[in-house]
Amino acid sequence: MTIFLAGFAQAQQLGVPQTAVLTISSERLFADSEFGQRVLREIEAEGTLLAEENERIVAELSREEKDLTEQRAELPPEDFRPLAEAFDEKVQSHRDGQRAKLDALARRSEEAQQMFFELIQPVLIDLLRESGATVIIERSSVFLSSDRTDVTESAIARINVVIGDGSTIENQANE
């Protein structure tokens, strides 16, 4: 009994509730951590650059389309058709290129989240052990629980200490 109470007191001192079940918000865990905030800033910046690039391409293609429309009145159909087809191919190529860049950006975000959750596993295991809990459940999947079981804030604080914004870890993984 004394050992159990000592473990309970130790868990309480560490800011971890003593319970068999803990809850956590994985969305907040990522979004509110230094790692997640850095990734989200980078993705947003790359998305903004991509949107600006797309606007430039659309403006360029609009000018070309206007020129092509003006040429249509002056050229015989057999001369105009290859120009129109080449323009259509160019438009489709730009669309495909931009779509591929958006897909790559989404993949990068997913890969960063996957890496994050792999990196934080030891932190969550420590929380689990310190609390004496047997399971950590996604908070959004729980119908009703006490806020005492939510260790999201505690986990974020520990994650920030252990991996920070993760930039050095990601750089090492990319080398």
Q: For each predicted feature, which ranges?
A:
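Bacterial N-terminal signal peptides
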Residues: 1-7
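Amphipathic, charged alpha-helical segments and their helix-to-coil junctions
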Residues: 11-175
